[in-house]
């Protein structure tokens, strides 16, 4: 496996085939997925107070609500109808459809259950500047880079089910203000994420046909892990270390 810098693969050995590409992607997840971040360790281990959990859910809403926007941009990159049809359900997963609840509504159940006003959450007025910068950078990435890289950047979902299971179990066990109903977003993603990643992984393995394209796929995944990690860095700095920037959400009693 090539060495990694903070932003890219950095080594001389090219990835020779699709199997080597998949192995490299999985190693990136093992080394860099945000389940390893100290903030998640605190969150899942019951070490945060309610205000800190509120801050996490509030900021994460901006990411969740931007996912269907990102996916609409991905769809716009493809002339191939079959790819657009396959990707379209991701928008419905988060936005919902007529008569069906989507992931954004489930996330608002979480924030409401934690005592946050939904209007305030949806306004995104209280989120950290770094949250906005990181999420917007992700939307811009899928707009500006190749369609192959746009799809590759979604592959953090390969590693999400284990994180969701850890989150459900840990938060239900440790926080008396959390119940199964408000954790419904994560339960639903346990079913949705594997379906999404099956297609995305097949796509990049099939369409990344040169060493340069395989490296670009890996670097797209590294970029996405940085997007996720940077959001948690900002949360930790603001709500664990106590350096809340002006204008951001301040929990009661903080």
UniProtKB/Swiss-Prot annotation:
Q: Which GO terms describe its molecular function?
A: pyrroloquinoline-quinone synthase activity
Keyword Nucleus carried by entry: no
Q: What is its EC number?
A: 1.3.3.11
Reaction(s) catalysed by this chain's protein:
6-(2-amino-2-carboxyethyl)-7,8-dioxo-1,2,3,4,7,8-hexahydroquinoline-2,4-dicarboxylate + 3 O2 = pyrroloquinoline quinone + 2 H2O2 + 2 H2O + H(+)
BP terms from Gene Ontology: pyrroloquinoline quinone biosynthetic process; sulfur compound metabolic process
Signal peptide location: none
Domain of life where this protein originates: Bacteria
Write out the entry's keywords from A to Z.
Oxidoreductase, PQQ biosynthesis
Pathway, per record: Cofactor biosynthesis; pyrroloquinoline quinone biosynthesis
**What is the stated purpose of this protein?**
Ring cyclization and eight-electron oxidation of 3a-(2-amino-2-carboxyethyl)-4,5-dioxo-4,5,6,7,8,9-hexahydroquinoline-7,9-dicarboxylic-acid to PQQ.
PANTHER family recorded: 4-AMINOBENZOATE SYNTHASE, PQQC-LIKE PROTEIN
Q: Family per UniProt?
A: Belongs to the PqqC family.
Specify the protein name. Pyrroloquinoline-quinone synthase
Organism equals Rhodopseudomonas palustris (strain TIE-1)
State the organism's lineage.
Answer: Bacteria, Pseudomonadati, Pseudomonadota, Alphaproteobacteria, Hyphomicrobiales
